[in-house]
UniProtKB/Swiss-Prot annotation:
Organism of this sequence: Gluconobacter oxydans (strain 621H) (Gluconobacter suboxydans)
Biological-process GO terms, alphabetical: DNA repair; DNA replication
Annotated NCBIfam families: dnlj, PRK07956.1
Gene name of the encoded protein: ligA
Name of the protein in question: DNA ligase
EC number(s) from the headed UniProt entry: 6.5.1.2
Record's keyword annotation contains Metal-binding: yes
C-alpha cells in the first residue's frame, strides 16, 4: 500500500473537514452552505485521493458517510436496513461507466448487459423517510438520519394524508417502506407568504421548508403545512413482495401509496439518455423540485447480489441535472460576517424567477470569485440555482452599457473594524476580532441555541439579537442567567407572562446537555455535529475533553493524539488548538459550564461482528465475485486490504491461492477456505 505524501494527507484532511461541515449543514440543519456542484467536486477529489492512497480512507470518513447524526430532541430508531445515499453521474459517459461496473461485478457478457432492465424515477428534492408497518399497522416513521439511525417523527408523519394507516392482509408481517416527503412549489410560495405576514423568516427553498416542517416538536405545526409523499422503495421485508422493482412500485400503489406517475420502466440502457432529455425539458413545468433522475436495476435478485459499496448501492445511480439559469441585475454586494469571522459577499439582485422560485439574493463565495468573474454593481448577471438549492452568480452578461468600478474587497471587518486577514492557502478572509466582534458574538449565540446545539425553544435568531442589543445576553452563560432580567422582559413588546415563563422553562430544560451538543454549540470552526460526536465519544466527559484540549498545544503529544482520532484529522485539531489557546474562550466555556447541571457522555455506536478485523482475499472464489466478498466483509465491519502483513487478521483462500497464502503461513495468520468464510459471514 502506497503511503500518502504529506501534501495529499493535508488536502484530504481539509476536504474531510469541509464535507463534514457541509453534510451537517444540509442534513442536520436543513441549511445547505454550498451548491451540489461544489459538493460533488470536493467529494470526487476526496475519492480520487483515497483511490491513489488507500491509507487515507477510514470507515468514519466522508466517503463512507450518509446524512447527519440524528437529533436527540427526537427519539432515535435504528433502521432494519440502512438508508444509504446514491452515487451521481452527470452525462451519458458517466452512466455508461455505471453500467460497465455493474456488468463487471456480475460477470456479464455483452448480451447480459443488453438484457439489463432499469426503472427510472424523478429524484425529488425533499426529505427521505422510512415507514415501518407491523401486522398491517403503521407503527413508526423515521428520517434518514446518518443512514443507520434516524429520528422518530411518527407523530408528524401521521398528519400526512399520503401515508396509509393500514396495509391489506397480503402485506408482509413486517415491512419498511421508503419515500420522500416534499412541499410543492405552489404550497411553498403560500407558506412563505404566511411566514412573512407573521414576521417570521421565510424559508430558502421548498426542501428546507419540507424538512423544517417534518422535524417540528409540535405535530400541529406539521399538520398545518401541506406536505406530500412519494413512495419509492422497500427497506426491510419479512417476506418477499415482488421479484422486480417495478412490480414492487405497483404493489405500493395497490396498498394506497402515491408513486411518482413519471416513473417509467426502461427496457434497454440505450434508451435512458432520451428519457433524461425529455424530463429535463419538462422539469420547470412540474409543481415540485427535482434535481435529477434515479435509475435502478429492475431485477431484485441482481440488486441483492450487487449490494453496497461504502455509502451507496451498486445497483442504482442518480443522473443529476444541470442547474436552471436566469438573467437579472446586480444591485448591491453586501459583506456579511459569520460566527467564525468569515467575510462572505452576498449579492442583492432584482428579483427573478429561476426554476419556479423567486430569487433576490445569491452567494458570491469569496473575493477570488468576485475578481475571477469580474462582477460589478449594476451589471446584468447570469444566475443559476446550483443543485436547485443555492442561487449562485455565474458571471456578467456582455453589454454595451457603461460599468461601475471593480468591487474592492474590504481588508477590515465591516462590523468591528478589526483587520480581516487571509491565511495562505485559504480562499476566505476572516475578521481577527474574535469574540470582541459583535457580529461573531451574535452569530455564535444564535448557533448555540439552534436546533442541533442547545435547541432552546422560544430563543431563536430574532430573540438573541433583541436580547443582545438590550444587554441581557452577551455570552453563552448569560442565557442561563436571563431570569435576572425577568421584570425588564415583561415590559418588552411581545413578551407576556406566559411566553416569558415558557422561555425560562425551556432554558432550565437545557441545563442538562449531551457533551456533543455542548461542543457543537460552541461554534468552533470546522466542528460540525459529527465531529463533535466523535470527540465526545472519544473523551467521554467534559473534564477529560477540556483537559486534553488545554494540553493540545502545537507539537505536543496530546495535539498529535487529537489529530489521530478517527474522523478528526489535523485541520480540525488545529482549530480546536487555536480555540483553546485564547484565554477569553476558556473563560467563556468555564462560565457556561458553571451554569449547567449535567454534561452527558455519548454512547459508542454498535459494531459488526467483524469490526476491527483486517481481511485479505486471495485466489478465485466460486460462489461470489471478489468485489461481492469484499462488500460483505466491509458491511460486517472489517477492513479489506490487498496485501498480507502483520496487521492482517484473516486470509480467505480461494482456488489457486498463491503467494499470499504462503506469506500468511509464514506470519502465523489465520486462514479459512471459501466455505469457512461463508460460515463466518453468516451466509
Amino acid at each position: 500500500m502506497t503511503t500518502a505524501p504529506v501534501s495529499a494527507a493535508e488536502r484530504h484532511a481539509a476536504l474531510e473537514a469541509d464535507l463534514a461541515q457541509w453534510d451537517e449543514a444540509y442534513h442536520g440543519r436543513d441549511e445547505p452552505e454550498v451548491s451540489d456542484a461544489v459538493y460533488d467536486a470536493a467529494r470526487r477529489e476526496l475519492l480520487a485521493l483515497e483511490e491513489a492512497y488507500p491509507d487515507l480512507r477510514s470507515q468514519e470518513g466522508a466517503s463512507q458517510r450518509v446524512g447527519a447524526t440524528p437529533d436527540s430532541a427526537f427519539g432515535k430508531y435504528r433502521h432494519l436496513v440502512p438508508m444509504l445515499s446514491l452515487d451521481n453521474v452527470f452525462d451519458p459517459e458517466g452512466f455508461d461507466g455505471f453500467v460497465s461496473r455493474v456488468g463487471r461485478f456480475l460477470g456479464l457478457d455483452e448480451d447480459g448487459l443488453q438484457a439489463l432492465q432499469f426503472v427510472a424515477e424523478p429524484k425529488i428534492d425533499g426529505l427521505s423517510i422510512s415507514l415501518t408497518y407491523e401486522h398491517g399497522h403503521f407503527v413508526r416513521g423515521t428520517t434518514r438520519g446518518d443512514g443507520i439511525e434516524g429520528e422518530d417523527v411518527t407523530a408528524n408523519l401521521l398528519t400526512l394524508k399520503d401515508i396509509p394507516r393500514e396495509l391489506p392482509g397480503e402485506a408482509p408481517e413486517r415491512v419498511e417502506i421508503r419515500g420522500e416527503v416534499f412541499l410543492s412549489k405552489s404550497s411553498f410560495l403560500t407558506l412563505n407568504e404566511q411566514q412573512v405576514a407573521r414576521g417570521a423568516k421565510p424559508f430558502a427553498n421548498p426542501r428546507n421548508a419540507a424538512a423544517g416542517s417534518l422535524r417540528q416538536l409540535d405535530a400541529e405545526i406539521t399538520r398545518s403545512r401541506p406536505l406530500s409523499l412519494f413512495a419509492y422503495a422497500q427497506g426491510y421485508t419479512s417476506s418477499p413482495v415482488a421479484t422486480t422493482h417495478w412490480d414492487y412500485l405497483e404493489k405500493l400503489r395497490s396498498w394506497g401509496f402515491t408513486v411518482n406517475p413519471l416513473s417509467q420502466m426502461i427496457a434497454h440502457a440505450r434508451d435512458i439518455p432520451a428519457y433524461v432529455e425529455k424530463l429535463a425539458r419538462e422539469r420547470s413545468e412540474l409543481d415540485y423540485d427535482i434535481d435529477g433522475i434515479v435509475f435502478k436495476l429492475d431485477d431484485l435478485s441482481l440488486q441483492d447480489r450487487l449490494g453496497f459499496a461504502g455509502r451507496a448501492p451498486r445497483w442504482a445511480i442518480a443522473w443529476k441535472f444541470p442547474a436552471e439559469q436566469a438573467i437579472t441585475r446586480l444591485r448591491e454586494i453586501e459583506i456579511q460576517v459569520g460566527r467564525t469571522g468569515a467575510l462572505t459577499p452576498v449579492a442583492h439582485l432584482e428579483p427573478v424567477n429561476v426554476g419556479g422560485v423567486i430569487v433576490s439574493r445569491a452567494t458570491l463565495h469569496n473575493e477570488d470569485e468576485i475578481a475571477r468573474k469580474d462582477v460589478r454593481v449594476g451589471d446584468l448577471v447570469r444566475l443559476q440555482r446550483a443543485g436547485d438549492v443555492i442561487p449562485q452568480i455565474l458571471g456578467p452578461v456582455p453589454s454595451e452599457e457603461p460599468r461601475s468600478e471593480p468591487f474592492v474587497y474590504p481588508d477590515h471587518c465591516p462590523v468591528c473594524g478589526s483587520l480581516a486577514e487571509r491565511v495562505h492557502g485559504e480562499a476566505v478572509r476572516r475578521c481577527t476580532g474574535g469574540l470582541t466582534c459583535e457580529a461573531q458574538i451574535v452569530e455564535r449565540l444564535i448557533h448555540m441555541v439552534s436546533r442541533n446545539a442547545f435547541d432552546i425553544d422560544g430563543l431563536g435568531e430574532r430573540s438573541i439579537r433583541e436580547f443582545y442589543d438590550a444587554g441581557y445576553i452577551r455570552r453563552p452563560g448569560d442565557i442561563f442567567r436571563l431570569r435576572q432580567h425577568e421584570e425588564a422582559l415583561l415590559q418588552r413588546d411581545g413578551w407576556g407572562r406566559l411566553s416569558v415563563d415558557n422561555l425560562f422553562r425551556a432554558i432550565e430544560d437545557r441545563r442538562t446537555i449531551p457533551l456533543s451538543r455542548l461542543i457543537f454549540g460552541l461554534g468552533i470552526r470546522r466542528i460540525g455535529e459529527r465531529n463533535a460526536q466523535l470527540l465526545a465519544r472519544h473523551y467521554q466527559t467534559f473534564e477529560n475533553w477540556r483537559t486534553a484540549m488545554l494540553a493540545a498545544r502545537p507539537d505536543s503529544e496530546e495535539r498529535a493524539s487529537l489529530g489521530a482520532i478517527m474522523g478528526v484529522g489535523d485541520a480540525i485539531a488545529d482549530e480546536l488548538s487555536a480555540f483553546f489557546s485564547e484565554s477569553h474562550n476558556i473563560e467563556t466555556l468555564d462560565d457556561l459550564a458553571l451554569e449547567l447541571k449535567d454534561i452527558i457522555a455519548e454512547e459508542a455506536p454498535s459494531e459488526g461482528h467483524l469490526s476491527g478485523k483486517v481481511i485479505v482475499f486471495t485466489g478465485t472464489l466460486t460462489t461470489m465475485s471478489r468485489p461481492e466478498a469484499k462488500a460483505i466483509a466491509e458491511r460486517l465491519g472489517a477492513q479489506v486490504t490487498d496485501s498480507v502483513s502483520k496487521k492482517t487478521s484473516l486470509v480467505v483462500l480461494g482456488e489457486k491461492a498463491g503467494s499470499k497464502a504462503k506469506k500468511a503461513a509464514e506470519l502465523g495468520i489465520e486462514t479459512v477456505d471459501e466455505s469457512g468464510w461463508r460460515v463466518l459471514a453468516g451466509l
